[in-house]
Amino acid sequence: MTQMIDLRRRGLLRGSGITVLSASAVALLAGCEKMASAQASNGASAANDIGILNTALALENEAISAYQLGAQSGLLQKPVLEVAVLFQTHHKEHRDALIATIRKLGGTPVPAKSDAEVAQALNAAALKNQTDVLRLAQRLEKGAANAYIGVIPSFGDRGLAQVSARLAADEAMHWTVLTQALKDPLPAKALSFGA
Amino acid sequence: MRLPALLLAVLALAAAAPAAAADAARGQELYESRCGGCHSLDANRVGPAHRGVYGRKAGTAPNFSYSTAVKNATVVWQEKTLDAWLINPQALIPGQRMNFRVALPEDRADIIAYLRQQSGK
């Protein structure tokens, strides 16, 4: 029975296909359509932006795997599990939008590493309880938010920089929810991200 | 309008004072929050593993798939090159894939101090 539930959960987690763009991804990308076309004719800048987007894609792929590992670990209880699945869905929408934008710019999206590779890199074997999983997710979300903020000055296209800020906002929202779930104090000072 | 002599003396002293020593402990906090989205000390993730990076030639972390630009770079990671990299990676090695920037000099210095410490240098 446990295995059946796990398999169904896996199906749920894997259900949103890579080939079909989610509504959010389409909406995000819609703002990039014109700039993507314009960028394609601006070689050096477009190539650099593709590089940034591919690094972001690798980060999103890692986040998807991390939530997959957390969900399959059996360590998460409701309602935390539902939140983790929702956040994974957000990361899949980010991934889809990034893939579509990279292709629009003429680039080739980087392939995702396997869940096993990510598990090893993140030392998932050390996760023993729900708090451990939440701490890992919290750490990765903060790192992701800061990564998106830190690449903003490097984009050649200001529209893509704005997309990076929107992605950072999603990751910051995830971090805040995870921080509340862990009952950690909120930052005492302003401007706690990107610093 | 003349500035009081005491104020002038204070300003002169401040200008002559050496930069504060880099703080590796603060660098660790910064590293975990700013670099930790993509990097770990001992595992290749989105970016290469960082333990041992200080003093290492760019593009030589074992088993990491680097961009051609970084693989072909002649840069050796030490204070000046790491600082330039964190100011603007693309300016130091055009064609690289990181593009993450750290704006404040004190933040860069502390992160570099931490990487140096973790590299045993």
Regions found by a protein language model. Give the residues of each.
Chain B
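Short Fe-S-cluster ligation motifs
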Residues: 63-83
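Solvent-exposed, acidic/flexible segments
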Residues: 24, 28, 43, 75, ...
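Sequence/structural segment immediately N-terminal to covalent heme-attachment motifs in c-type
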Residues: 22-45, 50
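N-terminal signal peptide c-region/cleavage motif recognized by signal peptidases
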Residues: 14-17, 22
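Short glycine/threonine-rich turn/loop motifs
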Residues: 24, 48-68
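C-terminal capping alpha-helices of c-type cytochrome domains
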Residues: 78-121
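Bacterial N-terminal signal peptides
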Residues: 4-15
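A generic structural signal for secondary-structure junctions
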Residues: 43, 54-58, 87, 116
